[in-house]
Amino acid sequence: FTAAGQEAQYVRYRRLLSGYTVQHVYSAAAYRLDPAMSLRQAADLMLLGGQKSFAVVEGDTVVGFLPGQDLVSALHSSRPFVPVAELMRRHVEPVMPGEELIDVERRMIEEQIDALPVAFAGRYLGLITHDQIITLRRLASAAAPMAPPRHTAANSPAN
């Protein structure tokens, strides 16, 4: 009966997140890292802003991703002055603003990461975290009839 309970919970989660996309919750103000920055500098940003994971960006292009768990592990190995470029994951594809949150959450779980970079037309826009998705789900659950905001030209990623 555990599998049936998990399936029912997944259906409920899917219903709560239905219609919500990345653009509804991602943070455009998230810190980003330059590949030449040291891991120590990345850790300083982690402490300063409470952000766990980071997009690695050159110009406006995402070139990698540094999950918090990778950063902490490297710092425990006494490697604070290693450049971010040596540790970053190079094959983490950014998500787009129009992607459904349920799909983004599933991908985070599968890839075992707590955040993903957000990009549109190859340009870095920000970061979406699993915590943001969980918070939205809790808000939607508390206000069950709450409908997702409508997509308008004013909140489109092109503006």
Whereabouts are the PLM-identified features?
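Short proline/glycine- and basic residue-enriched helix-capping loop/turn segments at helix->loop/beta transitions
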Residues: 90
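Amphipathic coiled-coil signal-relay and dimerization helices
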Residues: 62-67, 125-129
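Conserved active-site beta-strand-loop modules that form the wall/rim of enzyme catalytic pockets
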Residues: 52-53, 64
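The conserved cystathionine-beta-synthase
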Residues: 32-50, 56-58, 75-76, 86, ...
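Bacterial c-di-GMP phosphodiesterase catalytic domain signature
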Residues: 69, 73-74
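Membrane-interfacial segments at transmembrane helix termini in multi-pass membrane proteins
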Residues: 1-36, 143-159
